[in-house]
Every structure is written in C-alpha cells, then in structure tokens.
C-alpha cells in the first residue's frame, strides 16, 4: 500500500504504477485467443467439447448435453436457502424497477405538415451473457446483465458460464430463472465468446455479448467486436473514496476491502484531506484483512494497488477523482450532495457515510456493470440502452420534397455527388413520370 501526498512533486510518478495495472494484454494472450476463435469458427461444437475437456475438465458427448435443463434449475432451488432465494428475488425486482425508468419509446415528430421525422426503438433479437465462474460465483452478474435485457424486450437471452467439474453454482441458476434467462450452457472462456459470436450447430449466434470475465474472455470480446456488439472491455475492479475527515475509519476500510477481495489486480484508493484519518483507515485495513476468508487475494491487491492519498483540499481531491474516472466513487464526506455536481467522471457514485459500494453491487437498483480503467470519461454503466438499437424514420410528402429539395441538391452538388442530387431533382421536375 502506498501512502502518498498529492502535493508532492513525485506524486504522479509514484501513482503511475497503480494506473498502469492490467494495461498490457500481451501478444501471447491475444494469439491464444485468436487461435481459439478460429478453431471454434472452423470446427464448431467439436472444438467446444475439446476446450471444455481441456480447461474445465468436463467430459461431454455433445454440446447439447452441456445445456442446463429445467430440472437442474428446479434442483438448484431446492438446494438454496429460503432467505437467499428471497434476497435474489428482491434484487431482481429492484434492478428491474430501476431499469424500467431507462426505457425509451419510439417517437414521431409532426411539427411540419408535410414531413414526418422520428426514431424507432427496437430490442435486439438475441443476446449472450457471460457469467464468470472462477475464484468466486456471481449470481449478481446474472441479474445485472439479464434483467436490463429483459426490460428492453430482448427476444432471447442465452447465458454461458464456465463450470470446472460440471456444476453451475445453484445461486447462479436461481438468479438466472428470476432474471428471465432462456438458455444456459456450461461453457466458458474465449471459446464460449466465440460460440456466441459466430454460432455453432448447438449454440445460437447472438447480436451482442455482455458480462465480465478473465483476460481471455475480455480479449475474446474485443476481437469479436464488429461481428457482434459488446458492452465494454472490463478491466480489474476499482474504488476511490473521497473523504474530508468525517465518518468512521472502520467503515471506509471495509469499503476499500470490498474491492480488494475481487482479485489481485483490484485497486482500492482513499483520498482524504485529513492525514490522521487516512492513517487510521490504513491501520483498520490491516486489522480487517486478517478476518477475511479471501485474505490472500485482498492483501495482494491492497499491498500492490492500494493507496491512501492526502489532498490539500476537497476540491483537490475532486479534481483528482475526475482525472482518474473511477469505476466506483464514494463521497464519504459531510455534505455529499454539495460535492456531487462537481463530479464529472465516475461509473457509479455512492453518497454519504451509509451508502457502501456493496449496496450498488447487489440490490440498490442501478447496474453494477461499470466502466473501469478510466473509461468512465466516455463510457456509461450497462443499461437498457445496451439492449436496443435505434433507427431514424424519415417521411417526405411531395410538397415537403418540393419545399426542401433545392437545398438537398445544392449540398449534393458542392460535395460532387451528382447522382445524389439527381435522385431529388428527378422528382422535382417530374422526370420519369412519362416512362411509368
């Protein structure tokens, strides 16, 4: 963990190592993924079975046998505690309610009597969601990806999840049913992404792929983009807490560790105007680390990519936050609503001392699929918009074209596109009418 002062002349150099985490995919990883994608395109189901045996140690006679049955989902419900089922159902309901507010309708503008303009909103036909199944199991990832797709009106939601040993976590299956997932395959890695992007005899081709995964999954999504849509290239998780010396150090420490436990590349940063408060938080982090079941992962993350930064003022802390555009931003300050208008770049913003980032991860309502690695400068959280497409609608009556046609022709002429202009002028002059 680095204890830094933003006013030090060497601050940028010392902080650079944290900003650079996970930047290099590596040519070796990219080549491996390219080979897998090409193999799945060429051999389809046969390649999927081979990679599933190799990476997930799962023997299967066919890809069809890797599809989860309704009976298996029923059995998952029998294995999950009632209170856990209730919590997952509540999360789905709250996430659905929030995303309903994001829906856009098709609209038409009738402001001109002879011209009609508008926008048609159409749900995607089929999407694929990737649910990680590595060091932890994430039913919340199912909810955050499938629910907005369902709210958007997507026709079919296909889920893939790696299953070392052949079994999908029962909580993931419960979340999938509540979230409206149609089909689930025990497939993971770059090969699952390739199958969704190009389709095989068994796995249907989708229009868009969403959901987080390891470096191979992220690289595969990047490489198939253009063949299908993707949500974003997600990097390691991160949290930045802005603090003015108010609040409880134990609370801030717990919030920092909530990100550190994700993986060794996660970054947890506190920037505070009170050095003493920062020191108390750092000490509390050390105390709490020893209590975590995922201590090894969290400790590596904290020691390598954690930081406590002292700022000269709250405005200086805010400027720093806007510069790095964190995935998760907590405003652990006395008056968070005064600070909020000054925030320009953040994936999700959590206000006050009783709004831990974990609330947003699970059931507050907003999506937890957020831009990482500074991309909150230009990317947004996953939303209903990611599962629809928009088409422009244009209608000109004869009088409308007569009214605006001259301007269209002139712009076509100045661009040197004669046929463009003729497609209008031939109508204005009535040419071709005699040749009907």
Curated annotation (Swiss-Prot):
NAD(+) binds at residues 130, 191, 214. GO terms for biological process: L-histidine biosynthetic process. Substrate binds at residues 237, 259, 262, 328, 361, 415, 420. Catalyzes the sequential NAD-dependent oxidations of L-histidinol to L-histidinaldehyde and then to L-histidine. PANTHER family: HISTIDINE BIOSYNTHESIS TRIFUNCTIONAL PROTEIN, HISTIDINOL DEHYDROGENASE HDH. Belongs to the histidinol dehydrogenase family. It is an enzyme of class 1 (oxidoreductase). This is Histidinol dehydrogenase. GO terms for molecular function: histidinol dehydrogenase activity; NAD binding; zinc ion binding. Zn(2+) binds at residues 259, 262, 361, 420. Keywords: Amino-acid biosynthesis, Histidine biosynthesis, Metal-binding, NAD, Oxidoreductase, Zinc. The lineage of its organism: Bacteria, Pseudomonadati, Thermodesulfobacteriota, Desulfuromonadia, Geobacterales. HAMAP family: HisD (MF_01024). Binds 1 zinc ion per subunit. GO terms for cellular component: cytosol. Its cofactor is Zn(2+). It comes from Geobacter metallireducens (strain ATCC 53774 / DSM 7210 / GS-15).
């Amino acid at each position: 963990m680095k204890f830094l002062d933003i006013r030090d002349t060497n601050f940028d150099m010392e902080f650079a190592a944290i900003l650079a985490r996970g930047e290099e995919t590596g040519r070796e990883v990219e080549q491996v993924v390219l080979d897998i994608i090409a193999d799945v395109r060429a051999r389809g189901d046969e390649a999927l079975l081979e990679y599933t045996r190799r990476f997930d140690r799962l023997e299967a006679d066919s890809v069809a046998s890797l599809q989860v049955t309704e009976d298996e989902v029923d059995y998952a419900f029998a294995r999950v505690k009632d209170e856990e089922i209730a919590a997952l159902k509540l999360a789905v309901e709250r996430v659905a309610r929030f995303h309903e507010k994001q829906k856009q309708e098709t609209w038409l503008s009738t402001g001109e009597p002879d011209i009609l303009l508008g926008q048609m909103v159409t749900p995607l036909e089929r999407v694929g969601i990737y649910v990680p199944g590595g060091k932890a199991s994430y039913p919340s990832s199912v909810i955050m990806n499938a629910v907005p797709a369902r709210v958007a009106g997507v026709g079919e939601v296909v889920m893939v999840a790696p299953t070392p040993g052949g079994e999908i976590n029962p909580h993931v299956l419960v979340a999938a049913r509540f979230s409206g997932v149609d089909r689930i395959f025990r497939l993971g890695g770059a090969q699952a992404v390739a199958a969704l992007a190009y389709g095989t005899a068994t796995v249907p081709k989708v229009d868009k792929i969403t959901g987080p995964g390891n470096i191979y999954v992220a690289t595969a999504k990047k490489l198939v983009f253009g063949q299908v849509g993707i949500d974003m290239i997600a990097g390691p998780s991160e949290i930045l807490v802005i603090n003015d010396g108010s609040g409880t150090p134990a609370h801030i420490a717990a919030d920092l560790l909530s990100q550190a436990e994700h993986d060794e590349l996660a970054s947890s940063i506190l920037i505070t105007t009170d050095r003493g408060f920062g020191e108390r938080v750092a000490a509390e982090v050390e105390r709490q680390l020893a209590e975590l079941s995922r201590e090894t992962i969290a400790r590596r993350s904290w020691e390598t990519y954690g930081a406590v930064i002292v700022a000269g003022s709250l405005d200086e802390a805010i400027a720093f936050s806007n510069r790095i555009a964190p995935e998760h931003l907590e405003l652990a300050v006395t008056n968070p609503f005064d600070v909020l208008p000054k925030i320009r770049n953040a994936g999700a913003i959590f206000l006050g001392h009783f709004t831990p980032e974990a609330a947003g991860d699970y059931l507050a309502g907003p999506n937890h699929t957020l831009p990482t690695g500074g991309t909150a400068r230009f990317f947004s959280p996953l939303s209903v918009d990611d599962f629809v497409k928009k088409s422009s609608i244009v209608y000109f009556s004869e009088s409308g074209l007569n009214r605006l046609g001259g301007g269209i022709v002139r712009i076509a002429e100045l661009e040197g596109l004669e046929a463009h202009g003729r497609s209008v002028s031939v109508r204005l002059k009535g040419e071709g009418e005699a040749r009907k």
